[in-house]
């Protein structure tokens, strides 16, 4: 569906072509003076050497209003703005179209869209998820929904980092906590995980095995048993917490199985930019000038570094999309992994793929604040605040909404006091209340399929203009990965609806059916956008 904005931009481009001018066009939505406005003439005055007001008049005279009947009026305003008004029929048609499309409003064509693998969260299976993982999950899950809405086939993947020393630490931690069931003085290793989650895991081990492994020697066989058990119960708890958070995955891929299935070495052997030095195998990551030094991928003793499995895994993800031309893989990592970005991109390119087919988004840290003070420690775990504790404190929707309210590359403070409020100071409350009010209005009216025919009221037009921006929002987010644009859009839409509701008589008005159609369309778009964040959608509040 061609939007009104696209029609206006097309009319301006045609006018510029007549005047033999080339210039990008930006439209805004003014609070007054029309439905759309552009400062195009102001940006051209230096280039053309004449006043903006004169340029604006020339552009307006070149616009073919007979061709673009959706535009009912164009005016020039000082010092050189061009303002557009669109016909009432365009707005009514849009509202009726939204009500016809329902959940599919904003869907973009799948034609020409590549498949996308998004790997996110991917926390080590060594304990409960914490607040940093929560931000990763909120960003990743929302981006997956947005890209699907934009027409992409999306694969959600969790990489289980279950290979390496952190798993040995997990095994030793659970083993020690298990022994402490029988002997409270049993020592914990210095590098053990000391959170309460290890006690929970040890209790689960005791429930399954009883005292069978009491006072046993910590042999390789015993270590493997505790490592495997710890991995499984940690992953089980991770999945439980993600489920509560409204996050799910198509694939859980084990790092250990990358080696067991011999997926690593065939890929490593294909790297073009490796060399031998000091008995080790190095990857020439400085080759492109983006890394500060070359990296060892195989140590002198033949042991692989963590890079080997990661290099192979990234190619595996891409190949399994079965879309070598348009496919793309996206990783969402914490900002503390920034030094690893170029190494992975270089190795991906070194294997023969295009660099633009891998994207790595780095999200910044967050703090949880209550009563103006940072919550640094968990009351139960003695570690970072866990996702399950955060969900218990404020609920899924508040966490999902406020963790994507800011750009992923911005640090944020998650204010417990703010998100717990049920009043107009809480944007999530306002958004949900707007949806519930729409639902109640429609229930009371009992008109199943209202048809819009007259939306000349200023408040109705402003609200309709917000609705028509939704497809553009989907397109922008899909291209930029800026899912933080969703919350302010929802808040702006809710605000436009509340202004409409407060200033327009609906029941008994001659335009009642048109207004109810607009209410229905607003309800659809509010719900549609909230679903992208996996928020619960209330009909009553």
UniProtKB/Swiss-Prot annotation:
- Show the GO cellular component annotation of the record: cytoplasm
The cross-references to Pfam families, in alphabetical order and at most eight, read: Arg_tRNA_synt_N, DALR_1, tRNA-synt_1d
Classification via InterPro entries: aa-tRNA-synth_I_CS (IPR001412), Arg-tRNA-ligase (IPR001278), Arg-tRNA-synth_N (IPR005148), Arg-tRNA-synth_N_sf (IPR036695), ArgRS_core (IPR035684), DALR_anticod-bd (IPR008909), Rossmann-like_a/b/a_fold (IPR014729), tRNAsynth_Ia_anticodon-bd (IPR009080)
Q: Specify whether Ligase is a keyword of the entry.
A: yes
This entry's Enzyme Commission designation comes to 6.1.1.19
Q: Where in the cell does this protein reside?
A: Cytoplasm
Q: Which SUPFAM superfamilies match?
A: Anticodon-binding domain of a subclass of class I aminoacyl-tRNA synthetases (SSF47323), Arginyl-tRNA synthetase (ArgRS), N-terminal 'additional' domain (SSF55190), Nucleotidylyl transferase (SSF52374)
Q: What is its main location?
A: cytoplasm
For molecular function, the Gene Ontology terms on record are: arginine-tRNA ligase activity; ATP binding
**Which GO biological process annotations does it have?**
arginyl-tRNA aminoacylation
Q: Which reaction does it catalyse?
A: tRNA(Arg) + L-arginine + ATP = L-arginyl-tRNA(Arg) + AMP + diphosphate
User: Which keywords are on file for this protein?
Assistant: Aminoacyl-tRNA synthetase, ATP-binding, Cytoplasm, Ligase, Nucleotide-binding, Protein biosynthesis
Name the family: Belongs to the class-I aminoacyl-tRNA synthetase family.
Q: What is this protein called?
A: Arginine--tRNA ligase
